[in-house]
């Protein structure tokens, strides 16, 4: 009976996953498509890790998909390239600690104007706009908190990978892949402007670190503090 129940859960989960994939493709969300493709790339390499041709074929397909996503909405992609170029110039002016929270919205237009003063009117000139986010969460961290902030994010990622490898299980694998998907999506969009993303990320972190969280709360000092 338990086996039948688990099989039913797998079927339902597979059906929901299939519906989500179709919905993402139909929505033409390039960041979503790349996230799904990256997870598929990881799963294929885990299943056929001993076959080198699978790795090369997966890399080729991923590169073709990336190129296809660019040409799908070329003007939009070029607009983001302009935003990233101007954002990199902002990072160069305050690389270690960043410009502070809200700096992109406050100062981006100045850097965009400087870019066109330096390079003149080019293919990006028709795509220039007043934007409120760099369309890349990692670039956003660099702008707000500099390399110090980015190093803290990388330290957290390293810690989560360690926690996953130390106590691997199906539940943690799902949480880990969910975070990878969010991480890939964050390269191309403003993922963390939505509360839902924060909630999912927080839950995944709890799942990955639950053994260590349990140790913290079973520590005598913490227990006595809570009791007080």
List the predicted regions and their residue ranges:
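Flexible juxtamembrane loops connecting transmembrane helices in multi-pass membrane enzymes
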Residues: 39-43, 56-95, 106, 125-129
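Phosphate/oxyanion-binding loops and surfaces in catalytic or ligand/nucleic-acid-binding neighborhoods
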Residues: 44, 90, 94-97, 107, ...
């Amino acid at each position: 009976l338990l086996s039948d129940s688990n099989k039913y859960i797998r079927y339902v989960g597979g059906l929901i996953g299939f519906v989500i994939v179709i919905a993402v493709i139909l929505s033409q969300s390039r960041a979503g498509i790349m996230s799904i493709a990256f997870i598929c790339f990881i799963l294929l390499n885990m299943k056929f890790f001993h076959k080198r041709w699978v790795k090369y074929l997966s890399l080729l397909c991923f590169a073709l998909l990336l190129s296809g996503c660019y040409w799908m909405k070329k003007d939009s992609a070029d607009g983001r390239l302009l935003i990233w170029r101007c954002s990199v110039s902002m990072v160069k002016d305050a690389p270690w600690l960043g410009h502070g929270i809200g700096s992109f919205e406050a100062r981006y237009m100045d850097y965009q104007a400087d870019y066109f003063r330096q390079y003149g009117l080019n293919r990006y000139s028709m795509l220039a706009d007043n934007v409120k986010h760099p369309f890349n969460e990692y670039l956003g961290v660099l702008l707000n908190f500099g390399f110090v902030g980015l190093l803290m994010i990388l330290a957290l990622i390293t810690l989560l990978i360690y926690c996953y490898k130390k106590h691997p299980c199906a539940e943690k694998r799902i949480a880990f892949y969910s975070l990878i998907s969010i991480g890939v999506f964050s390269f191309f969009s403003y993922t963390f402007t939505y509360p839902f993303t924060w909630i999912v990320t927080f839950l995944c972190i709890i799942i990955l670190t639950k053994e260590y969280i349990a140790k913290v709360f079973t520590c005598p000092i913490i227990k006595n503090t809570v009791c007080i």
